[in-house]
Amino acid sequence: MFLPRLVRYRTERFIKMVPTRTLRRINHSSRDPIQKQVLALIKANANLNDNDKLKIRKYWSDMADYKSLRKQENSLLESSILHEVKIEDFISFINRTKTSSMTTRGIYRRECLYQCKKNLDLVNQVVSQVSSVRHQKPLTTQLDTMRWCVDDAIGTGDIVMAADLFLLYYRLFTDDKKLDEQYAKKIISVLAYPNPLHDHVHLVKYLQLNSLFESITGGGIKLTRFQLETLSNKALGLSNEAPQLCKAILNKLMNINYSLTNDLKLRDDQVLLAYKSIDENYRRGNVASVYSIWNKIKEHYVSISAHDSRIIYKVFKICTHNRAYRSICSEMFWQLTPEYYCNNPLILPAIIDFITKQDSLTMAKELMQNINRYTLPENHHIVWLNKRCLSSLLRMHLKFNDSNGVDRVLKQITTNFRALSQENYQAIIIHLFKTQNLDHIAKAVKLLDTIPPGQAMLAYGSIINEVVDWKLASKVKFTDNLMALVNDLLTKAHDFDPDHRNSLWNVVSALYIKKLCHYKKRDGKFVANAKKDIDLAKLLYINAAKRSKTYWTKSNCNPFIASSPCDVKLKVNNQNRFTILRNIALSALQIGRTDIFLWACAELYQNGMTIEELKLDWNFILKHQIRNSEFKTNKEIIQDIKKHGVSAVKRYLR
């Protein structure tokens, strides 16, 4: 299955280590075993070139595979070059080249580890002659040796090597089950310091150290608040370059062990870290991640109203706009007290928008009663009469055909703000379109002509969305004439925004892919072009994603009328990437194009979705029994997906 291979590829890329296949391709000038070739390098006492360094790395790779050495009945000590070389030659080579070569510094440190179990005298002889400390205290145990190697590496700024030496020690000596947490924390402290050129490698090393502790002790390394904060900031700094690594780090940090006796505020810091992660995934449109993280932290406080209102708002907004996740909005609405949301100018409009999308008249009546009952007099102007709240109320009254409410809100808007906003125009125009009455549509178009393009861009996007939906539903009497309207709107939008910076163009690109991927069945079979269109959707996405700059003109601003696929130009960025890929993947799954489905999942993975989030997302989208279930924890969700999940998703995303 390709997703695990993808994980390996990206990890290898982040560590920037030489892949095993490269080590195998080393063109050795000698047929001697690699150990003898390294010995020859040391005896020659010459400077190391790149090919020499590859030989040394191959030797290290062989030595780390201690199980293979045992099968060959060779001891670790006998396989070590320090066992074969004259100590004088070894020390001479090390002291001459160690200042300029990190590889040289790696040689003597690793050789000390190889020898430390059975030949501490030799180790001390090496340490006394290469150490920068004048009066080095003799090492008495193999653990002392590991600690000296780590300290020596940190002292010369070889931070990644310090982590590698720690990991190597416990790989070589598997009988030592008591992990040195003190030194692990010491290494993590230096890994946590900002180092832009190596931040990604440092974070991978943290994951490897933490994984070692999880495998042996059952729990990760306990961190201080400083380590938690610096590692999280490092990860967030790589959110664009390496979203999957960022996600892995944040997930670990949100679930690390902490001690109440040592740091009472660490758990609160983890909640703040979860907020940062929600914020990052909200920005990317990764609703599955936002849902999962919120589910982890929602019960941290006695009441969810104790959480940061900005986070509650973002959870409401992203889940409202993704139909499959609206159950969490319903849960939050009933858990929040009316006294809280009726006096919160950020949360109240989000709740109104959710109820409008949910089309629940019962909830709308409950909300309006609560607003009248619980809004404090001093908050009335701040909450009720702010622009966002009035826009949300206008949409709600339009949704439920409350003409009196619409008139009242419009009067308040014009009284307080003198003119309608683009959100207000959008709400009125799209309401007229949704009636599917030709007279009302004509009124909407007439109103649209009176609005400057800068105020009408939101309405343009909503109209095009509506027309595309009608087209997909084969409502010919509307779409035949209105496709000309779409072209007119996009031409006006291009004249106003020739560089296509407005979010309208993100919407247009996503809608074009949605239309392209839509399939129809005739007599139980897919129409002939369904599979070709899904290939075209993939090609258009790839071309748009890799294109650094597009030169927009009137001839390419409307993809819906392009005469050839070559003429279609789309805009793909973090604002619409997830929507486009999910549409492609969903259609591919439904028409049996497993290859395209897996490709789209791989793209989503590379842009920050974990395999667990992909499974959650597809099960929520495809299976109403799962999305409508009431889950208390993420563990319950995982168990339910394992038991009742979509079989195709189980089969493909293993």
UniProtKB/Swiss-Prot annotation:
<comment type="function">
    <text>Responsible for conferring a stable 5'-end on cytochrome b mRNA.</text>
</comment>
<protein>
    <recommendedName>
        <fullName>Cytochrome B pre-mRNA-processing protein 1</fullName>
    </recommendedName>
</protein>
<dbReference type="GO" id="GO:0005739">
    <property type="term" value="C:mitochondrion"/>
</dbReference>
<dbReference type="GO" id="GO:0003729">
    <property type="term" value="F:mRNA binding"/>
</dbReference>
<dbReference type="GO" id="GO:0006397">
    <property type="term" value="P:mRNA processing"/>
</dbReference>
<keyword id="KW-0496">Mitochondrion</keyword>
<dbReference type="GO" id="GO:0000958">
    <property type="term" value="P:mitochondrial mRNA catabolic process"/>
</dbReference>
<dbReference type="GO" id="GO:0009060">
    <property type="term" value="P:aerobic respiration"/>
</dbReference>
<keyword id="KW-0507">mRNA processing</keyword>
